[in-house]
């Protein structure tokens, strides 16, 4: 009897995308085990640099003995191809941002998100099992009508973070300034406006020799990005740098330049950049929301319900009090050691016991 294929179906496949990185890690594991494995995605949503690394959805044709894994974060053509497949099906749930965050900024996207949340239970019912990348996501999936998801946390790979930093970017940004860093899409659920307001207080009242680097695509929600730019102008706060999308080498540079990593996100399924920042030894301050606490694993600094002045004072203490900073960084390094020692392949084999030949 021939081995089953282990293929993955994605709505899109992009540089710097956490779901895409997860798919690559799983594909590499499956191939290492000796299984044929490909990533299939909608060509309209594939980065030009990755077109040779995946196949179009129209090429997918899984048979009854094959296994199809679908990374679900938005209703898409990939979901349709997945549910119509004859293969045995596994849903991997990456969370769907609640649509209310986008209403007023992008009503069309809000409608897409609402549809995705409404459809996920039906997609899950057509699968033999569902995995969630955090306990928070498993509970969210249950609330949407698909209980009993098994938790398979987002897999961390250090390889992209061990690249040589971008020399030109490092030279451009090297300066005697306390650097606050935030990495992620500029989207309403990230609550970047909260970070900007706290930074304004920090810069004007506590440390004028400071800057805020916002690294991430501004295409996720153009109206929200415009609002953020207007807020910076209204506050007349300097050194707020919208850096846009970062290359892998550029991202390493940003982490190495940072004194603090801050996430004000009000909704996170997990939060991969939190782990990346800890890997680089950057103290992390994050809102206690969604799967953030799971990503931090008891490390970093979690906050909730802070006013801008209070959050600014927290920035100051973590950045300037050496003993506190050393304790935070030590706890983060313990967390990273645990993350790197995680038996990922053992977990995968256990999850796939009923799908692979013994």
Predicted regions span which residues?
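Nucleotide-activated donor-binding/catalytic signature segment of Leloir-type glycosyltransferases, i.e.
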Residues: 225-249
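Glycosyltransferase donor-sugar binding loop
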Residues: 41-45, 211-229
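Short hydrophobic beta-strand element within catalytic cores of glycosyltransferases
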Residues: 274, 283-286
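Short alpha-helical donor nucleotide-sugar binding micro-motif in glycosyltransferases
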Residues: 253-258
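Aromatic "clamp/platform" in nucleotide-sugar-dependent glycosyltransferases that forms part
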Residues: 266
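Conserved donor-binding/catalytic core segment of Leloir-type glycosyltransferases
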Residues: 131, 171-190, 196-199, 213
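Donor nucleotide-sugar binding/catalytic pocket of nucleotide-sugar-dependent glycosyltransferases
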Residues: 124-166
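Conserved acidic donor-binding segment of nucleotide-sugar-dependent glycosyltransferases
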Residues: 301-308, 317-322
